[in-house]
From Swiss-Prot:
Protein function: Catalyzes the irreversible NADPH-dependent deamination of GMP to IMP. It functions in the conversion of nucleobase, nucleoside and nucleotide derivatives of G to A nucleotides, and in maintaining the intracellular balance of A and G nucleotides.
Any one GO CC term of the record: GMP reductase complex
Protein name, as recorded: GMP reductase
Leader sequence residues: none
Active-site residue numbers: 176 (thioimidate intermediate)
A family per Pfam: IMPDH
Family affiliation: Belongs to the IMPDH/GMPR family. GuaC type 2 subfamily.
EC code(s) of this entry: 1.7.1.7
Lineage of source species: Bacteria, Pseudomonadati, Campylobacterota, Epsilonproteobacteria, Campylobacterales
Record-linked InterPro entries: Aldolase_TIM, GMP_reductase, GuaC_type_2, IMP_DH/GMP_Rdtase_CS, IMP_DH_GMPRt
Length: 327
């Protein structure tokens, strides 16, 4: 099988005639399941990216979020709290035995979260298929996101098992070293993998990993993503979990992968690493900037909403458009 592959930095979208007077007229709203959200983005469900207070802020302000699964006991109180406040509840599960019992416990307590994400590194597996079916049996109203995957076969199989959306991306993230440790993954061709998977999908796809700029969010939408999961761009904020250190008068915050020893607390099956990211200030400011950039993109696409982006032409430029200049 030969597949023409490319990644984010290899692609440029081609503008269409602008039909709005101001980019502020452009609507970045996206629908996922029964809810509409302000933007097609979701912070990665990683310990150094999302925490309860960030989740509450996002839910209150109309953004999608997925709470991480690394504090299992906190999930039921969290769902109760979100439901009490009438905000969306969105959590993650793994596939181990205790997670099966956890799903049954949610059902027993009559606590159906709005969204559950089954979150494992290699999502094309029987354990994920069984977990999808278990959630659909016990919590039929819950929207199930399953991943991560990197092939059309995987997307079809998880959709057929009952997944309402699939998450595409194996190891393209900044703190993911799966591609180095195992030789497998979508690192270096994530955008082409997304396109390949989206062509097979009948349900929404969440692009996960490899997003380095706001323009990459737009490229993901062009190639079939409904939602775009973002780690490193959301790391390093005032509100982020994780340690802060000062070096030569500059503040940095830690950011580590979900399969790193820092998250696991042990050196076993390590496929993530830790990096220090320069402190970025307030998360609110980053969200505002992202929103404005998305509005600009819609105006370049010649439309008024995200749909316009899906139809634009593109070119594949096999040289990096940034020439190594980080924004």
């Amino acid at each position: 099988m030969s597949l023409k592959v490319f990644d984010y930095e290899d692609v440029q979208l081609i503008p269409n005639k602008c039909i709005v007077n101001s980019r502020s007229e452009c609507d970045t709203t996206v629908i996922l399941g029964k809810h509409a959200f302000k933007m097609p983005i979701v912070p990665a469900n990683m310990q150094t990216i999302i925490n309860e207070s960030i989740a509450e802020f996002l839910a209150e302000n109309g953004y999608f979020y997925i709470m991480h699964r690394f504090d299992g006991a906190a999930r039921i109180p969290f769902v109760k709290k979100m439901k009490k406040r009438q905000w969306i509840s969105s959590i993650s599960v793994g596939v181990k035995k205790e997670e099966c019992l956890f799903v049954e416990e949610l059902a027993k307590q009559g606590l159906a979260p709005d969204y559950i994400t089954i979150d494992i590194a290699h999502g094309h597996s029987n354990s994920v298929i069984e977990m999808i079916q278990r959630i659909k049996t016990h919590l039929p109203e819950t929207f199930v996101i399953a991943g991560n995957v990197g092939t059309p076969e995987a997307v079809r199989e998880l959709e057929n098992a009952g997944a309402d959306a699939t998450k595409v991306g194996i190891g393209p993230g900044k703190v993911c070293i799966t591609k180095i440790k195992t030789g497998f993954g979508t690192g270096g061709w994530q955008l082409a993998a997304l396109r390949w998977c989206a062509k097979a999908a009948r349900k929404p796809i969440i692009a996960d990993g490899g997003i380095r700029t706001h323009g990459d969010i737009v490229k993901s939408i062009r190639f079939g993503a409904t939602m775009v999961m973002i780690g490193s761009l959301f790391a390093g904020h005032e509100e982020s979990s994780g340690e802060t250190k000062i070096e030569n008068g500059i503040a940095y915050k830690e950011y580590f992968g979900s399969a790193s020893e820092f998250q696991k607390g042990e050196k076993k099956n390590i496929e993530g690493k830790k990096i220090w990211i320069q402190h970025k200030g307030s998360l609110k400011d980053t969200l505002v900037e992202m929103h404005q950039d998305l509005q600009s993109s819609i105006s370049y696409a010649g439309g008024r909403d995200l749909e316009a982006i899906r139809k634009v032409d593109y070119v594949i430029v096999k040289n990096s458009i940034f020439n190594g200049d980080a924004i």
